[in-house]
Amino acid sequence: MSKEKFQRVKPHINVGTIGHVDHGKTTLTAAITTVLSKKYGGSARAFDQIDNAPEEKARGITINTSHVEYDTELRHYAHVDCPGHADYIKNMITGAAQMDGAILVVAATDGPMPQTREHILLGRQVGVPYIIVFLNKCDMVDDEELLELVEMEVRDLLTQYDFPGDDTPIIRGSALKALEGDADWESKILDLSKFLDTYIPEPKRAIDQPFLLPIEDVFSISGRGTVVTGRVERGIVKVGEEVEIVGIKKTTKTTCTGVEMFRKLLDEGRAGENVGVLLRGTKRDEIERGQVLAKPGSIHPHTTFESEVYVLSKEEGGRHTPFFKGYRPQFYFRTTDVTGSIELPEGVEMVMPGDNIKMTVTLIHPIAMADGLRFAIREGGRTVGAGVVSKVLV
């Protein structure tokens, strides 16, 4: 292979603002784009451009989200900001905007509030790996001791949810003053950008992770064997490599004897590509949609897990009535529906449309899964909820 030509491309990182209502998330987002565009190029975005977020659909759920982008010294960032509290919850649970790290905005005038706690907890449950704190509205607090107290509270809260509270960077600033062009407060935004560059490590790209392909279809080709098709979710599969078929039935091993894309034969299939994989000695009836093809040992089948779930409201096309323990909907993982029963937390009798809730699910068939896997909850083919596996149990 010839050497790739050198391109001046900064690494790409996904981040977002989280925190309590009115603590300044959107103002901070506007301030970041404004201050950084002056220094590193790019376009400044005004508060009302960000606040007026377009609707998006993710897993059948409508979410209002604003996407902005900016450059720092070392990287290019895609940054997501949501106008409403419910939008944040939906966003984090559906993984509509996967975050490599989050900026937690806490107003120094208020300290941590209920949604501060809820966003940190959700961050832990859905696998937001890093949090940086921006202590906002510091121009309105003259008392150094008060600022230290708020910082301590935030660190304690982070530690409570298994984030490294003591080592978390906390930047004291004023998003509004920075947005207005006050140089002292602008420098705090630059400090924040440096922490984004250094505290959030570069994520492992999909191509460098162990091979996984969710099976969408299975064909039998006479004289050649069985072909499964699907989009490679991560990693690379090479001709001649051993792979496992995981989920629904007992895990079996087989060998990839060919990879094709658009009827052309390839040496390998890579993350993001839609491919057909030819399998040696596997019969058509031994494999089905909903299983995955994976690097041996990299993923295991499970039936029981804890999850964080958002239940669609009636207005979003969800259920019109609550559900109770013993509810048995379908759980849609990757390419297939599996029936499962639910257990609710102690003291919770029912779940209303529009709620978000922690629940334990037991499926009737095992599915290849690991913490962080997203799913939809469906009844008769329509989506009534969205969730994420927070902890695999059995």
Swiss-Prot record:
**Region of interest: G5:** 174-176
The domain of life for this entry's organism is Bacteria
Q: Where does Mg(2+) bind?
A: 26
Q: Does the keyword Lyase apply?
A: no
Which GO terms label this protein's molecular function in UniProt? Answer: GTP binding; GTPase activity; guanosine tetraphosphate binding; translation elongation factor activity
According to the record, the residues making up region (G3) are 81-84
Cell compartment(s), UniProt: Cytoplasm
Q: Name one GO cellular component term.
A: cytosol
The cross-references to HAMAP family, in alphabetical order and at most eight, read: EF_Tu_B
Q: What does this protein do?
A: GTP hydrolase that promotes the GTP-dependent binding of aminoacyl-tRNA to the A-site of ribosomes during protein biosynthesis.
Give the quaternary structure. Monomer.
Q: Which NCBIfam families match?
A: EF-Tu, PRK00049.1, PRK12735.1, PRK12736.1, small_GTP
List the protein's name. Answer: Elongation factor Tu
The organism's lineage is:
Bacteria, Pseudomonadati, Pseudomonadota, Gammaproteobacteria, Enterobacterales
Tell me the gene name. Answer: tuf
